[in-house]
Amino acid sequence: MKTPKNDVYTVSRLNGEVRQLLEGQLGRIWLNAEISNFAAPGSGHWYLTLKDNFSQIRCAMFKGRNQAVTFRPANGQQVLVKGNISVYEPRGDYQLLIESMLPAGDGLLAQQYEALKMKLAAEGLFASDTKRPLPANIQKIGVVTSPTGAAIRDILHVLARRDSSIEVIIYPTPVQGSDAAKSICDAINLANSRAEVDVLLVTRGGGSLEDLWSFNDEGLAHTIYNSGIPVVSAVGHEVDMTISDYVADLRAPTPSAGAELLSKDADNKAQKLLSQLSRLKQAWQHYQLKKQSQVQTIEHRLQKQDPQRRLQMYEQSFDEMQLRLQQAMQTKLHAYALKQQNLSSRLANQSPQHRLTLEAQRLSYLSAKLNDAMDDKLKMSEQRLAHRAQQLDTVSPLATLSRGYSITLTGSGKVVQAPSDTCVGDTLTTRLRDGSVTSTVVEVS
């Protein structure tokens, strides 16, 4: 049988082409699974297995990615991960390189939220050029919210404090539950049909991601976008960002902040600046969404020729060798521990008490000898110090002054040694034993 020359693969070439094929065909995927065999070596990378009832896959999450994870993964935990299928070429194992990880419950909602946000951004619902300016002189505000919630009380309190002349019309609707999104849409449509207010404030107080989920509805997004009345979205707290915040003409971080935006105040310039900043933020967020999509496309193209991928492969290999070394060291230490126990048992049968007594006596003798030597050394040092101090005192200028002499200095601090060192009019300082005398030169001879 002839051996083919052109179609013979090496193992490295085969694994490399399999990796490129998997990465090119599947790309980035989401996976919902249970964690097992979780390991976090000193390199900072994470290695784990994701499994369900029938299958499992090895995974790696490198340090630059896992630093963004807000919880500590544990075996048995259900998670939602996003990553890329790849092949660890040295072993020929295919694995998932994880980019992000969320707890399964919050993760599914977050995935739906991100998918809808990308879709609506692509449709242009977040574009800054579609945002309508708020009326310059607002007389009536329509509030779409629950009539019994804390949000409406905060809004009415702020409006009463800032501008009691503004009329408020409440379009009551539930803001939480399976039917809440449709009810909010109906309230917005009702306000548009009546055309009785200058602006709509769609709002509710804070809550969990599930509590705010009605404001992440696609139908509600289109209703806000198609509203003939400008819409301000003020949902939850400042850290909460819902789809309604992105599509509204203006976003306020809280219900109270929404009321402040829509009411007059002596500091009108600050209100305008806040509005401009909010629009700038929305434009920046829209720009980020657009660029994020472009970056993801470029990342996918670069994955096949990413030098960091090869570095990560070597790091993964190093981590595996490190784990094996740790296991070998633990086995060796256990063997040494058993040997030490055996030696200790044998030593206990041959008491070294006599030798310890001799060594204790020797130690006491050496300690006393060391103390004597230290005392002798200290006395010699004190004598040398006293001798040096006497020598310094002999040549010290201060000793000369104490014997009745004086030293005259020029204004620059130079010692006057001859008449030529001074000029008429110079100020001189004469140092005496108990002080100094300042004088002026009137004649030099």
From Swiss-Prot:
Its EC number is 3.1.11.6. It catalyses: Exonucleolytic cleavage in either 5'- to 3'- or 3'- to 5'-direction to yield nucleoside 5'-phosphates. It is an enzyme of class 3 (hydrolase). Keywords: Cytoplasm, Exonuclease, Hydrolase, Nuclease. Its main location: cytoplasm. One of its GO terms (molecular function) is nucleic acid binding. PANTHER family: EXODEOXYRIBONUCLEASE 7 LARGE SUBUNIT. This is Exodeoxyribonuclease 7 large subunit. It comes from Shewanella pealeana (strain ATCC 700345 / ANG-SQ1). The gene is xseA.
